[in-house]
UniProtKB/Swiss-Prot annotation:
Protein name stated in the entry: Large ribosomal subunit protein uL2
Keyword line: Ribonucleoprotein, Ribosomal protein, RNA-binding, rRNA-binding
Family: Belongs to the universal ribosomal protein uL2 family.
Listed GO biological process terms: cytoplasmic translation
GO CC annotations on file: large ribosomal subunit
Domain of life where this protein originates: Bacteria
Amino acid sequence: MALLKSKPTSPGKRGEIRVVHHDIYKGKPHAALVEKLKKTGGRNNQGRITVRHIGGGQRQKYRIIDFKRNKDGILGRVERLEYDPNRTALIALISYKDGEKRYIIAPSNLEVGATIQSGADSPISVGNCLPLKNIPVGTTIHCVEMKPGKGAQMLRSAGCSGQLVAKEGVYATLRLRSGEMRKIHVLCRAVIGEVSNSEHNLRALGKAGAKRWRGIRPTVRGVAMNPVDHPHGGGEGRTSGGRHPVSPWGLPTKGYKTRSNKRTDTFIVRGRKKK
């Protein structure tokens, strides 16, 4: 993995910084693990915009990822590492002894030809998946389940990892990158190591068009709109909004707490660190 700064042959290239992976597979994905992905443009089945700033971009095919890691006791070999346009992390194609192939989120330092396995008896090595009760305290983990058997839901993006800091009764305590300490059931599974492509946050796209290739449309400021479109809109000349910052629907933004799921507050031992 390396950061490549382009020569300033154009204004767009001047600010571009790319993450280059020399060990990545250059061919097409495994056909049996690929599905069609339809563009929505951020619209629902009524044609109304439900998610802003989405539209256009290159076509992608969805790679089916094995988040459950339930092939216990069967050794798998890393056939290749691949780019996945649907996520920030790299993915690895695993070929199992019984002939089945699956994609997984590739951890850092997982090399082509390495062997991985799942199950309670698996050794504590990068890429192996075990229940939390079988992982030693202090281990770095990623792809953590929130309900036993549901599949990984936490710590799946590039460079993400958490640390197992305690085990007490039927719950284990995890420390997340945000500083949050959270209880997870000990039968939930996690993968050893850190998610690959940790330099993803250092890249710079360089130009607006690179965002459009990814299907991301521009974000217009509220003060640049008309009163019908936004609470900050209107006014003669340039204005500063005249009120505390709000969303297009009038809800306070910039620090306003939106979490209302009090039912799961009991599992949060300590909240996120304030920036």
